[in-house]
Amino acid sequence: MTPPQKSKPKRNRRKIYKILPQNQCPSVCQICRNPAIGYHYEVPSCNGCKTFFRRTIITGRKFKCFKVSNCLDGNDVIDTSKRVCRACRFEKCVQAGMNPMAIQAEAKTDEGEELKKLIAKKFENGEKLNDGTVFFNVHDRLNQILGKLIKIETKLEKVHDNGMPMGFLDQRDLSTALSSKVIYNNMEIPSMSYTPVKISKNTGLPKRRSRNFVHSSCLASIEYSKTFDFSSAIDISSKIILLKNTALSCANLTNAYTTFRKLKSDTLLYPDGSIYGPPRRKNGPLIEKQRSFLQNTLISFMTNNVDKTEYILLKAIVLCNPAIIDLPYADSKHIQREREVYAQCLFRYCLLQHGTLHGPARFSALLSIFNVLENQQKEQKDYYLYIKLIHSQKHKDPEVLKKKCISVIYDQIMD
């Protein structure tokens, strides 16, 4: 026979107001020791502590004591007209036995519902809350996500802004680039090849070299994608499908933001200040059309006066695109979950910045930039295909065609 299992001791949850004399109002609040006005959530308390506990549970707020978590200890009456440590006040409410399940109002956030259930479970099992238990409110969650994205953006600025090392070529394909570790400086690109300086036949002088900012901006988008949670959950083939559909749009967003906020220009520029697109000496209807559609995202940024936070969240949403047809369903779900987080953050940010009246309209205006991005990406790829076709007819030698290509990675993205 197996010995009988010991039952887990349960905390006595008999309601305090049922063991005290009838028709007698408690005199002291068990949290702040001010005069009590009655029993609230099964504990003698004042109106202030009752409201504080209810509001904390409903919103799921997070508080932190900056001392030693004993701000409300002792027997002295707490002056609630002054600022009281909210972390210690809430801990005192829990220790006194306030029952979150007695709150009739529903929690307004997932964090609030989680907090409510956790405290109720601890009470049932006769346990105490762990020291340092953390619950995020909306502001904390927004700041946490933004902090992570800003850190990533800052670290990848060198990849986008510095261009390729002069005279060096990145000859990797998209699969190889995605399989390697994240790089934060173009000098770290593995297996770069060096191209000797060419001498002009006409002048006898060395030809001007390009830093290939077009390639480095797309490379920055690829490195950016590796920092997201979904990157470790989906396979390499899904990553390639995703980047072929999103890398160029992310690069266009970064180019527009760099021009608008950093270089303070109303014409799209490369990070070194030179004009983006075909050289000024080239002209013609197709060239002018290209110059025109390259400005579209920048125009949207200027029209909507997009700030840094909005840009960073928009870029994350653009990258996390689960609606790509060829993506496997399981992989698209990973991407969708992450996209929903960034979309919610952008909506919350719009509400914080523009209020409940104008916030939703601001959110819609920012999302409308996606249409501009989609159209610009389509025009860029169509134009690239056209130019590629012309070169293939003009140059039959594959080696010559290879030299005309910006990079293997860019060619795959534009395909």
Swiss-Prot record:
Its main location: nucleus. One of its GO terms (molecular function) is RNA polymerase II cis-regulatory region sequence-specific DNA binding. It is found in: Nucleus. One of its GO terms (biological process) is regulation of transcription by RNA polymerase II. A zinc finger (NR C4-type) spans 29-49, 65-88. The keyword Transcription regulation applies. GO terms for cellular component: nucleus. Belongs to the nuclear hormone receptor family. Orphan nuclear receptor. This is Nuclear hormone receptor family member nhr-153. The lineage of its organism: Eukaryota, Metazoa, Ecdysozoa, Nematoda, Chromadorea. The gene is nhr-153.
